[in-house]
A protein has these predicted regions:
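Alpha-helical transmembrane segments of multi-pass inner-membrane proteins
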Residues: 1-22, 26-94, 98-109, 205-212, ...
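Long extracytoplasmic/lumenal interhelical loops at the membrane interface
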Residues: 12-13, 18-19, 125-140, 152-191
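A conserved mid-to-late transmembrane alpha helix and its immediate loop/hinge
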Residues: 26, 30, 140-143, 149-152, ...
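Membrane-interface catalytic loops of GT-C/OST-like multi-pass glycosylation enzymes that act
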Residues: 28-31, 75-79, 177-182, 243-254
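Membrane-interfacial loop-to-transmembrane alpha-helix junctions, especially the N-terminal start
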Residues: 60-61, 219-229
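A membrane-periplasm/extracellular boundary helix in multi-pass inner-membrane enzymes
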Residues: 75, 91-132, 136-148, 156
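Transmembrane alpha-helices of multi-pass inner-membrane enzymes
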Residues: 85, 98-105, 227-268
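Alpha-helical transmembrane segments
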Residues: 208-222
């Protein structure tokens, strides 16, 4: 049953990370999806934490943020960790430049802490990580897919059907690859330049509209939603470079629902 399937999955490479036993994924079946969900909620909640004036609510937001950050750390999702940096960058650019000092903590943590989290993060640059190698191979195949059908693509949701014809790496017909582990390449491959441009325009338009809300003269609540929505779009834009998290229906539903909530709160 479902419990047995969840117990059997660990999402780790025991040869590359022998001390890493399990990655948290909750009911989302994949740690990267849980990481994407966490950064979306962190984005919105951070905005409300910063703008909240009532002490009790601020403490409540702080506790929930701490739990979410701990959860994000335990996913061991490097893409999600990098998207957290995008949230900090967004706060630096659009809220308070002093948040930029948080980036100076990264080398300090890497220097003094040598646990599994640091080892997993640094493996991005080692050239020996299997998941990184797989992604480069998938991107090479996806680029070939785009070059062959640049305008209209292979068809919406048909990546897994087209991939075997461009399989340069796995060479196993029983392994299904559902997406390119890169939202940008995946959209271009499935719906071509025309459809891909339309999708990406719609995606980044959410961030632009949220920015307009945040910089506008609406209520404090609406401007806070605007800031949170802007941070969320920046975070998903970054994590989508190494995974196609919006392929997951639960994550996609959450993202577009939160986008609708943020954008719809404005008096356009």
């Amino acid at each position: 049953g479902m419990a047995a399937d969840m117990t059997a999955q660990s999402w780790v490479d025991p040869e590359r990370f022998p001390l890493l036993r399990r990655r948290m994924y909750s009911t989302l079946e994949n740690p990267n999806l849980l990481g994407a969900y966490a950064v979306m909620i962190i984005s919105i909640l951070t905005a409300f934490f910063l703008r909240e004036r009532q002490k009790k609510r601020k403490w409540a937001f702080a506790i929930i943020l701490f739990v979410l950050l701990l959860c994000l750390a335990l996913t061991y999702s490097r893409g999600a960790w990098l998207s957290l940096a995008a949230i900090v960058l967004g706060l630096t650019l659009f809220y308070d430049k002093r948040f930029g000092f948080l980036f100076f903590l990264i080398p300090l943590v890497l220097f003094f802490y040598h646990g599994q989290m640091v080892e997993r993060f640094l493996s991005l640059f080692s050239g020996e990580d299997t998941s990184v190698g797989l992604r480069f191979a998938l991107w090479e195949s996806t680029i070939a897919m785009i070059e062959e059908r640049p305008l209209l693509g292979v068809g919406w949701g048909s990546y897994y059907l087209a991939y075997p014809d461009y399989n340069f790496f796995i060479q196993d017909e029983h392994v299904l690859i559902f997406h390119a582990h890169n939202m940008y390449l995946n959209m271009l491959a499935e719906v071509g330049i025309i459809g891909g441009a339309a999708f990406l325009l719609t995606f980044f338009a959410q961030g632009f509209l949220c920015w307009k809300l945040y910089r506008g003269k609406a209520s404090l609540f609406t401007r806070t939603l605007g800031l949170g929505g802007l941070l969320m779009v920046m975070a998903i834009a970054v994590i989508s470079m190494s995974d196609h998290v919006l392929f997951g229906r639960s994550i996609s539903f959450c993202f577009w629902s939160l986008s609708a909530l943020c954008v719809g709160s404005g008096d356009w």
